[in-house]
C-alpha cells in the first residue's frame, strides 16, 4: 500500500488544470493507503493504528488521529489534486452506518465526507483530544505526538472541496437489501438484523453467536435454516 501511495502522489504531482481524476473508493480504502507525513515512519504509523484500535477509542476518534498524520487520508489526496488545478469526480461505496439507501446514483452527493478523496469532518483538536482522553501520550510513538503537538494550522485537514463532484453508488442499507434478496432466492428465510451496529469485533461476535444459539435452540426470531444479515462498522 505504501509504494502504491507514492505512485499515486507522483501521478498527481505531474497533473495539471486539463486533467481529470476519476476516483472509485469503498469502505476500508483509507486503511490500505498508508502514507505518513514527513517525519513519521510507516512503522510508527502502523504502531499508532494498532495502539488506537486497542485503546477503546471509537472509530471517528481513531480516524481523527490517523487522518492528521497521513499524506493521503483526511482529504489530503484530494487537496493535492486541487493544488494542481485538476478536477476530481468521486464514486463512493459507503460502509458508514449513517448513510441512507441510495435513491438515484445519478444525483451528486452534496454532503460527502470521506478519505482520501473527500473533505474531513474531524479536526486536529479532535486528534489531540483523543490522545488526551485515552492517556496515549506515553504509548504512541514520539514522532506522532511530537508532530500533532507542533504542526499547528498547517497540519489541519481540508474541510470542503466545492469544485469536486461526488456520487454515492452503494450504502449499507443497499447491501443489506441485496443480500436479503439473494438469500430469499436460495429459499432461505432472511432477516436484516441491523445496519447500525458499531463496536468492537469481540463484542459483536459474541452478540451474533448468541442470536445463532437462540435460533438453534428455540427457533426465534426465525426458524432455521435462515440467513441473518447484519452490516456494521466494527474494529
Specify the residue positions occupied by each region the protein language model found:
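Short glycine/serine/threonine-rich phosphate/pyrophosphate-binding segments
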Residues: 30-34
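Hydrophobic/aromatic beta-strand patches that form the interior of the parallel beta-sheet core
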Residues: 22, 60, 89-93, 191, ...
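Accessory alpha-helical/coil subdomains and C-terminal extensions
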Residues: 85, 89, 113, 117-207, ...
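Conserved phosphate-binding catalytic cores of ATP/NTP-utilizing and phosphoryl-transfer enzymes
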Residues: 6-11, 70-80, 207-217
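Solvent-exposed alpha-helices and their adjacent loops that cap or buttress functional pockets
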Residues: 12-18, 24-25, 70, 79-86, ...
Amino acid at each position: 500500500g505504501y509504494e502504491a501511495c507514492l505512485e499515486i502522489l507522483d501521478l498527481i504531482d505531474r497533473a495539471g488544470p486539463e486533467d481529470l481524476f476519476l476516483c472509485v473508493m469503498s469502505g476500508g480504502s483509507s486503511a490500505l493507503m498508508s502514507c505518513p507525513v514527513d517525519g513519521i515512519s510507516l512503522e510508527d504509523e502502523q504502531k499508532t493504528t494498532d495502539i488506537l484500535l486497542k485503546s477503546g477509542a471509537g472509530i471517528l476518534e481513531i480516524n481523527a488521529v490517523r487522518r492528521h498524520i497521513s499524506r493521503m487520508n483526511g482529504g489530503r489526496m484530494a487537496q493535492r489534486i486541487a493544488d494542481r488545478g485538476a478536477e476530481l469526480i468521486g464514486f463512493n461505496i459507503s460502509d458508514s452506518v449513517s448513510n441512507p439507501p441510495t435513491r438515484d446514483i445519478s444525483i451528486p452527493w452534496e454532503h460527502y465526507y470521506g478519505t482520501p478523496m473527500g473533505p474531513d469532518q474531524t479536526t486536529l483538536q479532535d486528534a489531540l483530544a483523543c490522545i488526551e482522553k485515552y492517556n496515549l501520550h506515553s504509548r504512541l510513538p514520539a514522532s506522532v505526538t511530537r508532530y500533532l503537538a507542533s504542526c499547528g494550522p498547517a497540519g489541519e485537514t481540508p474541510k470542503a472541496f466545492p469544485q469536486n463532484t461526488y456520487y454515492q453508488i452503494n450504502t449499507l442499507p443497499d447491501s443489506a437489501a441485496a443480500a436479503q434478496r439473494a438469500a430469499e432466492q436460495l429459499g432461505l428465510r432472511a432477516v436484516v438484523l441491523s445496519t447500525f451496529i458499531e463496536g468492537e469485533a469481540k463484542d459483536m461476535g459474541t452478540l451474533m453467536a448468541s442470536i445463532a444459539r437462540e435460533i438453534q435452540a428455540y427457533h426465534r426470531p426465525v426458524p432455521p435454516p435462515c440467513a441473518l444479515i447484519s452490516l456494521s462498522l466494527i474494529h
